[in-house]
From Swiss-Prot:
PANTHER family: ELKS/RAB6-INTERACTING/CAST PROTEIN, ERC PROTEIN 2. Its main location: cytoplasm. This is ERC protein 2. It is found in: Cytoplasm; Synapse; Presynaptic active zone; Cytoplasm, Cytoskeleton. Residues 14-25 have a biased composition (Low complexity).
Length: 957
């Protein structure tokens, strides 16, 4: 009845047919009746209707590329399922299923959907949000009232239909009884009416064909209604899923893109549904034409029945066969008139049903609700069942007429029995007249009911005017939506500008982080230099301690010698005769001492030569080391291009900071120990001064002491030169070590080959240091031996050496204080820079988290959009290659987006884990080292997203 749809060419000329709608079985019949006119006559063909339904069903989510490809027959963004279109609001807006089913159409977004859209995205102001919550409640009240009215009307119509069915059953029983009486009273005189019966049989065959076609069309419409119901269910499921997704993301800020394309899409949808309305009206007119043809066939049947009734009524005596035939035909005509009257009533009811369908159709355009669509479907099914029952009754009547005609051919021998039956029939005719009167009364009742229905139609027209006003309100809301779309577009542009500013700010922060890491590296190098200086000072302090110990031993030897000399002086005073022998022994001792001094000079010259040779060898080794360092520098310059990420460097800095703090603690403890040792040495020096004062009281050895002082000064000069040379070599070594440390910072991230080279270099430098320390120890031992031998004869030189040692100790203390001050300043600067670094890292983390969140939201929106498109393409149940290729392409895009989403979530989880580790490490270090500088943390915040994440410009576009 309303599901026969046929194809018409697209605006571009490519015919497309809805894949879900089965083809009408009345195609050939309708073509013959319409004369092949697709849209020229009063009614459009079903192909035109179906093609227009398919042509206007392609309004999906519009993109920039859709404007270029509208003329094509492939639909990558929308679907083509029986006049339906899927409109998705961007970022989790409510999905509305709009369709053009037979006599059920929806125009664009419904008012409730528009308001729900504004409810979801209307969080820009409190008053606007409150207003958006008030409007849907009013509309719900209006909708509920209209639904209640429609339900009441439907109940009344159902009651009327039940009454009509009962009346038809009663009339069918009456007609059956009359037909039985006609069969019993039939006579063979009606052989004359065979020609009429043949015509009637031809008409009946035509009517049967029409009834069969109408029955097939009813089945076809039931199939279409079931398909539409399935699509409605799937669309509701999709709406439910998308509403859940939008509800899950309701707490987050949305990026609404209600642009001009969306507004154009809504206008196109509105125009499409207006055209669908026009087509549905055409289908209704076509159905009215079909009803008129059925009326004509029923009128023809009524005429034949009237003739039969007149013939029956005209039957009287057997001698008056013609009069009897006329009477029978008259009675048959009366029965047919009753049937025609009932059919007229049926036609009126069908017209009323059509008007009600139009009204419901208009209401469904304004407010397409699933409850209304269900109610309309139930009404349609009821009407279909009513039509089917009427058609069955008509078939029964036709069968009875044929049986009457067949039974009309009787033999002349049975005429007497028929005369008796005619008398019985006359009695029955009286009964039929009374029944006719009752039917007339019932007709008057039906007329009163028709008046009531007219009043209902007037109320429905009033409601239609209200709906028009509602449409005007919707137009005003559309204009408001356009303004809001422009505002949202400006906000989107502003957000994009903010994103660009944040990216530039992130780049600046990364540059600042790199500069700070470089400054931190330089400060770490300075701290290492300080540590090296502290080590040198410790070595000097150790040498001085050894010298002091040697001097103490020499003082003890001198004390013993003094006691011996005193004993000798006493022996000389007691025994003057032994003076000559004592002088001889003294001269021999002096000669022995001179020989010993000469031997010591020769040994010192040999040691000097050996020392010079070793110094030259050390210089050669230093040159070789410098050449190797230059080669390593060349390799480093070649490999500096591969130094991209600073994580390992930051972790090495953190470990170095921890080691540095531990070394500083150990150095502070060592300095305190050295202070205590210096105090002890000062006390010992005081004792030595007292002993020297006692030794100066002896004037006999003054000349000898002067000579020994000269020799000691000469030896001191030589030792000073050697010490200066050693210091120069140590400075060279420090420079080499500083260069090595600077290079170690860069070499830490290079390959294992450079690491092995640097390990070998470190070993060589350590060996060189060890050799130099051994050389220093040898020189110190030689000097100590020389000084011991000198101090065995010279007491005055001890005082000078002790003064030199005190001066050296004071210098080392001053240098230690200076290094402590420098260390404190560097620690403060490092703490400040590390705090600045921590702030920069926190800002960078926050910005990275915001960017990752925005990218995840964009990916989720894109994935949900792809899922919706895939589901709608799969629901279309089309086996065309184009749709399958579109589904496969959408699935590939969805897989790619899901892969990107997984990468984003992994990066975000990694960033969160790094933040947790950094915070935990910072808290632990701050808890255990509250009075010290916190070490540099690993630079996990420098983690950048993978290049795959930056390939998502399509999402941000």
């Amino acid at each position: 009845m309303y599901g026969s749809a046929r194809t018409i060419s697209n605006p571009e000329g490519s015919p497309s047919r809805s894949p879900r709608l089965p083809r009408s079985p009345r195609l050939g019949h309708r073509r013959t009746s319409s004369g092949g006119g697709g849209g020229t006559g009063k009614t459009l063909s079903m192909e035109n209707i179906q093609s227009l339904n398919a042509a206007y069903a392609t309004s999906g989510p519009m993109y920039l590329s859709d404007h270029e490809g509208v003329a094509s027959t492939t639909y990558p963004k929308g679907t083509m399922t029986l006049g339906r279109a899927t409109n998705r609001a961007v970022y989790g807006g409510r999905v509305t299923a709009m369709g053009s089913s037979p006599n059920i159409a929806s125009a664009g977004l419904s008012h409730t959907d528009v308001l729900s859209y504004t409810d979801q995205h209307g969080g820009l102001g409190g008053s606007s949000h409150h207003h958006h919550h008030q409007v849907p409640s009013m509309l719900r009240q209006v909708r509920d009232s209209t639904m209640l009215d429609l339900q009441a009307q439907l109940k009344e119509l159902q009651r009327e239909n039940d009454l009509l069915r009962k009346e038809l059953d009663i009339k069918d029983s009456k007609l059956g009884s009359s037909m039985n009486s006609i069969k019993t009273f039939w006579s063979p005189e009606l052989k004359k009416e065979r020609v009429l019966r043949k015509e009637e049989a031809a008409r009946m065959s035509v009517l049967k064909e029409q009834m069969r076609v109408s029955h097939e069309e009813n089945q076809h419409l039931q199939l279409t209604i079931q398909a539409l119901q399935d699509e409605l269910r799937t669309q509701r499921d999709l709406n439910h899923l998308l509403q859940q997704e939008s509800g899950n993301r309701g707490a987050e800020h949305f990026t609404i893109e209600l642009t001009e394309e969306n507004f154009r899409r809504l206008q196109a949808e509105h125009d499409r549904q207006a055209k669908e309305l026009f087509l549905l009206r055409k289908t209704l007119e076509e159905m009215e034409l079909r009803i008129e043809t059925q009326k004509q066939t029923l009128n023809a049947r009524d005429e034949s029945i009237k003739k039969l009734l007149e013939m029956l009524q005209s039957k009287g005596l057997p001698s008056k066969s013609l009069e009897d035939d006329n009477e029978r035909t008259r009675r048959m005509a009366e029965a047919e008139s009753q049937v025609s009257h009932l059919e007229v009533i049926l036609d009126q009811k069908e017209k009323e049903n059509i008007h009600l369908r139009e009204e419901l159709h208009r209401r469904s355009q304004l407010q397409p609700e699933p409850a209304k669509t269900k109610a309309l479907q139930t009404v349609i099914e009821m009407k279909d069942t009513k039509i089917a029952s009427l058609e069955r009754n008509i078939r029964d009547l036709e069968d009875e007429i044929q049986m009457l005609k067949a039974n009309g051919v009787l033999n002349t021998e049975d005429r007497e029995e028929e005369i008796k039956q005619i008398e019985v029939y006359k009695s029955h005719s009286k009964f039929m007249k009374t029944k006719n009167d009752q039917l007339k009364q019932e007709l008057s009742k039906k007329e009163s009911e028709l008046l009531a229905l007219q009043t209902k139609l007037e109320t429905l027209s009033n409601q239609n005017s209200d709906c028009k006003q509602h449409i005007e309100v919707l137009k005003e809301s559309l204009t408001a939506k356009e303004q809001r779309a422009a505002i949202l577009q400006t906000e989107v542009d502003a957000l994009r500008l903010r994103l660009e500013e944040k990216e530039s700010f992130l780049n600046k922060k990364t540059k600042q982080l790199q500069d700070l890491t470089e400054e931190k590296g330089t400060l770490a190098g300075e701290i290492r230099d300080m540590k090296d200086m502290l080590e040198v000072k410790e070595r000097k302090i150790n040498v001085l301690q050894k010298k002091i110990e040697n001097l103490q031993e020499q003082l003890r030897d001198k004390d013993k010698q003094l006691t011996n000399l005193k004993d000798r002086v006493k022996s000389l005073q007691t025994d003057s005769s032994n003076t000559d022998t004592a002088l001889a022994t003294l001269e021999e001792a002096l000669s022995e001492k001179e020989r010993i001094i000469e031997r010591l000079k020769e040994q010192r010259e040999r040691d000097d030569r050996e020392r010079l040779e070793e110094i030259e060898s050390f210089r050669k080794e230093n040159k070789d080391l410098k050449e190797k360092v230059n080669a390593l520098q060349a390799e480093l310059t070649e490999k500096e291009s591969s130094l991209i990420d600073l994580k390992e460097h930051a972790s090495s800095l953190a470990s170095a900071g921890l080691k540095r703090d531990s070394k500083l603690k150990s150095l502070e403890i060592a300095i305190e120990q050295k202070k205590e040792e210096c105090n002890k040495l000062e006390a010992q020096l005081k004792k030595a001064h007292n002993i020297e004062d006692d030794s100066r009281m002896n004037p006999e050895f003054a000349d000898r002491l002067k000579q020994l002082d000269k020799e000691a000064s000469y030896y001191r000069d030589e030792c000073g030169k050697a010490q200066a040379e050693v210091d120069r070599l140590l400075e060279i070594l420090k420079e080499v070590e500083n260069e090595k440390n600077d290079k170690d910072k860069k070499i830490a991230e290079l390959e294992s080959l450079t690491l092995r080279h640097m390990k070998d270099q470190n070993k060589k430098v350590a060996n060189l240091k060890h050799n130099q320390q051994l050389e220093k120890k040898k020189n110190a031992q030689l000097l100590e031996e020389v000084r011991r031998r000198e101090f065995s004869m010279v007491d005055n030189s001890q005082h000078l050496q002790i003064e030199e040692l005190m001066n050296a100790l004071e210098k080392t203390r001053q240098e230690l204080d200076a290094t402590k001050a420098r260390l404190a300043s560097t620690q403060q600067s490092l703490a400040e820079k590390e705090a600045h670094l921590a702030n920069l890292r926190m800002e960078r983390r926050k910005q990275l988290e915001e960017i990752l969140e925005m990218k995840q939201e964009a990916l989720l929106a894109a994935i949900s959009e792809k899922d919706a498109n895939i589901a709608l393409l799969e629901l279309s149940a089309s086996k065309k290659k184009k749709t399958q290729e579109e589904v496969m392409a959408l699935k590939r895009e969805k897989d790619r987006l899901v892969h990107q989403l997984k990468q984003q979530t992994q990066n975000r989880m990694k960033l969160m884990a790094d933040n947790y580790d950094d915070d935990h490490h910072h808290y632990h270090h701050h808890h255990h080292h509250h009075h010290h500088r916190s070490p540099g943390r690993s630079q996990h915040s420098n983690h950048r997203p993978s290049p795959d994440q930056d390939d998502e410009e399509g999402i941000w576009a």
